[in-house]
Amino acid sequence: MVNYTITEKEIALALKHVVTNISPLIKPTQSLLKTVYLILKKRFIDNYRFVILEAPTGSGKTIIGLIFNFTYSFIVSLKEEGLNIEEIDLSEYDLLTYDVNGYYLTSNKVLQEQITNDIKRFNLKSVMSIIKGVENYECIPATDEFNDLTKIPNKLRERIIKKNPDAKFASYTYRKCINYSGEKLRKKFPECIDICPYKCARNTASYINLAVLNYAYWLNVMRVPKNPEVKKYFDIRNVTICDEAHLLPDIVCNLFNLELTDNILVKINNKLDDIEKVFSFNQKSLEVKEHLKKCFKFFKFPINNFSEVITYCEDMLELGELLTEMMKEYNSVSKESFRNMYGDIFDDLFDDIASYEDYLDNMSKLSERPEDIYFESEKNSNFDIQKYKHIIKDLNESRTVRKNCIDKIDFGLFMSGTLGNMDEFAKLLGLEENEYTKMFLPSTFDFTKSPIYLTDSGYLNYNSFDSNIDRILDVCVRITKLHENEKGIIHTATFKINNMLKERLMNDRSIDFSRFLFYNTTAEKESLLSIMKQSNIPYILVGPSLYEGIDLPDDQCRFQIMIKVPYAQINSYVKKKMERYPFWYKRNCIEKIIQAIGRSNRHKNDYSKIYLLDSLFDKIIYETNDEIIGRLEYKKMR
């Protein structure tokens, strides 16, 4: 991070110029401008590398991020030219001409949609662009095949429909060019280069001043800096803005945990069976078969020693070498017919196997820190043959976040309405004390019509659950009758409670069961959420994972019920994590409570009622924040 000589007045002048010129439709409040000014001051004068900002719903986090990025870009461009901002006529400098500067990272589709709308609304296409996951982009040649009803059987269509019955096109996931890049891609698919929706979006985002990416996409492109094909599009930028940043530690750790299954071995084994029918086996294919048996053994039993993981990674790399030799032998005999039939398939498998080089490197380094190793084996009960899935985690999570995320950031702005103790958050990120500073924005919402009721309906801890759950579910049903003409959410905390409530409702003839929307998968949840938003029926969305990424303003949600305090389920991994980060368990629960309450009351004059049923809420709710505590009322539901 480069430090510049700059005055407070220069920052103020640059900020004023940006706000005046960026878009006439952006009209920030004085409070918002003061926030941006203070962030800039902490970066350029106080020389902090990271700013942690707790800003509640409705405080304009997106606009704060946009104005900060463009002002930062403007200041740096002028300072790189050696200019004193107080001594020049800023009207002669076009702030929209400056180069690549920042990333704006989001956690979910709701935020991406909001930013997409802001880009259109504020006419920011020349300085800001969004790139989504590849499944959101159409592959034109694959879609042509998908829509070819004369092709029987249409295997591509069958694959896509099986995964998504409502699919209208073939996404980039199913692209024909999957194993091609560079000059080979141009020769094989010349017509795709300039019209591919995904590649066009990627190209635009790669040279735009502010690129909007989701966390997973950004983390994946940052993890392969040695790949020139990736680096030419995305590299470390001056600014990285993280929205909903409270999710960042879990997102990073979940992405970089190693989960090993035998899926790739099954694919290879199936292809070998096909090859045998067409070409018969040769000596090399028999060697591959024998080596496969060795690899499969890794999944027949739980892991007892971490060295088994390293050995398996080595075995997979050896498998790749054997497959390469096998293909050479088949190609020499079949005069390229083998390559034509199976080349693309094996190229894909080789890419998967190549990942084991990184796995082996990471696992070898982790083995040097035995105190940080955690592994578990989950029995797969979906098959007649007993086999296991193996999960390996690094217990030093702050180190994982630091290495794979923080070290890829030049200057970082972390924003969320749910940061709680910001020093704890900084510790989870692996930040040093002298690297970061903290800021807090109070809510400007009017909560006078939005009480949060502590109903003290019974304890749902382990010892009291069975004796109280039926009574609490009855209370839940009675509350829904009080809001029979209003939409709402019921947070069940677990699928067990979810199913118990579902059964309770189905057996109650006084209830219109069709009003309650239950889901089993993320896709179902998103579909039901869309139905709920678009319908006038007073639906109630019910589930254990409705804390994040849901925007239900006004009549879309007038009440919420939280049945149980959302503590994480205690297992061996959670116990280990609690030993390492004693504050994490309670912090994780508080985050979920605050996020859940925030699904309604989406703007200053919005209102809703919140019902907390589990008596354990009384023990933790006072550790949330002042806005929530100020809304609390005790109310027995009889």
PLM features per residue range, with description:
Residues T71, E113, N117, E191-N331, ...:
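Signature of the SF2 helicase/ATPase Hel1-core->accessory helical subdomain module
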Residues D456-D466, A523-I620:
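Conserved RecA-like P-loop NTPase helicase motor core
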Residues T492-T521:
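Conserved helicase motor "Helicase C" RecA-like lobe of SF1/SF2 P-loop NTPases
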Residues N47-F68:
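Walker A/P-loop
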Residues D456-A493:
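Conserved interdomain hinge at the start of the Helicase C-terminal
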Residues R186-S206, M222-V230, N331-L454, F518-K525, ...:
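A contiguous, basic/glycine-rich beta-loop/short-helix subdomain that forms a polymer-engagement track
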